Amino acid sequence: MNPIKNVAVIGTGVIGIGWIIRCLAHGKKVKAYDLKTKSRSKVLKEIKRSSQYVKKMFRIKKIDLKNLSFHKTLKDVLFNSEFIIECAPENYKIKINLMEEIGKYSKPRAIISSSSSGLLPTKIYSKCLNPERGLIGHPFNPVYLLPGVEVVPGKKTSKKNMLKTKK
């Protein structure tokens, strides 16, 4: 299995920002998308605030902001992404509709991970194209400091995608 290089993060609340920082610390290229127009400044402020801890924990010299880009549409953020992290509000209607859109615009083999803490993955991915790529990846918080992630498959999630996600 090839390592994942391109990650999309949808939603830039506390969990989404945590995922962005963690992915950047691991050298991933990260695309961010949020409906809120002020998300860019919020993300950059949190990266700056947390950078001293992140650099120590991951033993890196800096968080490379060249690997971070912000996008205005869902279609743009999903283009060429291999791993998609959804961090939308904890609401079935929102997540089901979002997963349907993600399924339309993402690469057919892209893994889709919802950061949901209590919703069922089979229901979240019920309208998603290729539901075998969908799963729950619920992180411990703060995401960029605590390495634990609860990975939960849906009924149709493939074993291959589970293994790749756990890496």
Regions found by a protein language model. Name each.
Residues 24-25, 77, 142-146:
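Short, flexible turn/loop "capping" segments at secondary-structure junctions
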Residues 35-38, 42, 53-111, 119:
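Rossmann-like NAD(P)-binding element
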Residues 114-167:
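Rossmann-fold dinucleotide-binding core
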Residues 21-24, 78, 100-103, 125, ...:
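A structural alpha-helix within SAM-dependent methyltransferase catalytic domains
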Residues 1-56:
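NAD(P)+-binding Rossmann beta1-loop-alpha1 motif at the extreme N-terminus of oxidoreductases
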Residues 29, 67-69, 133:
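Conserved beta-strand segments of alpha/beta enzyme cores
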